[in-house]
Amino acid sequence: MGKPIVAIVGRPNVGKSTLFNKLAGKRIAIVQDTPGVTRDRIYAEAEWLNYKFTMIDTGGIEPESEDIIVSQMRRQAQIAIEMANVIIFLVDGKEGLAPADEEVAQMLRKSKKPVVLVVNKIDKLKDENNAYEFYNLGIGDPVTISSSQALGLGDMLDRVVEYFKDDELDGEEDERINIAFIGKPNVGKSSLINKLLGEERLIVSDIPGTTRDSIDSYVDTEFGEFTLIDTAGLRRKSKVKEEIERYSVIRTYASIERADVCILMIDATEGISEQDQKIIGYAHDINKAILVIVNKWDLVEKDDKTMDKFKKELKVNLSFMPYAKYLFISAKTGQRVVKVLQTAKECYDNYTKRVKTGVLNDVISQAIMMKEPPIVGTKRLKIYYVTQIGTKPPTFIFFVNDPACIHFSYQRYLENQLRENFDFQGTGIKLEFRERKEK
């Protein structure tokens, strides 16, 4: 089950970006934040009271002129309604209630989504009375904060995580493997999914996904049970291209969040784009299993060396994830389509693989004998013991004399030894080094 998503909504200049940046300033144990395709930050991984969740920064979706405030706010609220599990509705306690606030509140009431009404810019105790007029929005009791001074943020987050308890964390873990198909429009994502569904007889159901442009399809196969997440992307025309791009990116990121395995689809006739690199880079950063599929392979003139050459070029462009698996298919003709879910399952199996501690230490001991750690400064790294502490991705702790002695080249050597011995293709692995005093 994916982490809950929390979106911050509000008209321009109420302090959305200030609030987001304050929360992303390590004040609530941010795990990671990632720039999107646009220059604005879009996502931040957060934790509060042991609840992990994802924050969406909708601060960049703002009108440039006042005459389109209401229409823009309607779109922004719609994005939050579609994607978020909980919505923070931010209003300005200094300026007071505005027509745009009422417009958004009306949409939020209809959505039936949990909303935490937050009155910002309450910098002093005497300003508390400014919050009362916001009861007229019919959203519930407001929480007062000052995002610039970091006042009241704990109370606000307490209210937010209250909504997680029943729906997000107490449910049974879904045993299905979630696969997100990501890539540019018209690369063949929907065609491939339709092909997969058409060839499998045991389809459970099709249900609307969390976003207007995503559809979840459930399918059972001999390789396992899967949820196929199609991120179609926005196709409607708009004068503001960056705004539409941002909507599309947010939707794609939401699908990545929910996925175990991310399949990046590339058009063989076009190659990989900068946006492809950034989107799959996000999946890499948050430790998803990854499969790269080159579609429309039937349209490429080729000889016996073409595939190897194409794969080599892809690996150069995706050098930050050398572990990725590759598959060349044609969704149109069905070429190698039968291997898609099988290969995705292989990625998932490696993503969730556990290695016995005894075998693990034998491999590392042998690796040390073959190549001794280098001296860093005046000390040489000593590795006493290794154990695996988690999966998704496989995570290993090395107990050593001094973590500062680990050289990046030797860390890469240890990772390569683990990969050669245990096959972690399709998934990243994490190596952590912890000091243990020699007895």
From Swiss-Prot:
Q: Which residues form the KH-like domain?
A: 353-437
In terms of Gene3D superfamilies, this protein maps to: 3.30.300.20, P-loop containing nucleotide triphosphate hydrolases
Keyword set, alphabetical order: GTP-binding, Nucleotide-binding, Repeat, Ribosome biogenesis
An example GO BP is: ribosome biogenesis
Task: List residues binding GTP 2.
Answer: 183-190, 230-234, 295-298
Pfam families hit by this protein? KH_dom-like (PF14714), MMR_HSR1 (PF01926)
- MF-aspect GO terms: ATP hydrolysis activity; GTP binding; ribosome binding
- Domain EngA-type G, by residue range, is 4-168, 177-352
Has keyword Nucleotide-binding?
A: yes
Q: Where does GTP 1 bind?
A: 10-17, 57-61, 120-123
Q: Which NCBIfam families match?
A: GTPase_EngA, small_GTP
Q: What is the stated purpose of this protein? A: GTPase that plays an essential role in the late steps of ribosome biogenesis.
**Would you identify the family this protein belongs to, as annotated?**
Belongs to the TRAFAC class TrmE-Era-EngA-EngB-Septin-like GTPase superfamily. EngA (Der) GTPase family.
Q: How does it assemble?
A: Associates with the 50S ribosomal subunit.
Name this polypeptide is given: GTPase Der
Can you name the source organism? Clostridium botulinum (strain Okra / Type B1)
Q: What is the lineage of its organism?
A: Bacteria, Bacillati, Bacillota, Clostridia, Eubacteriales
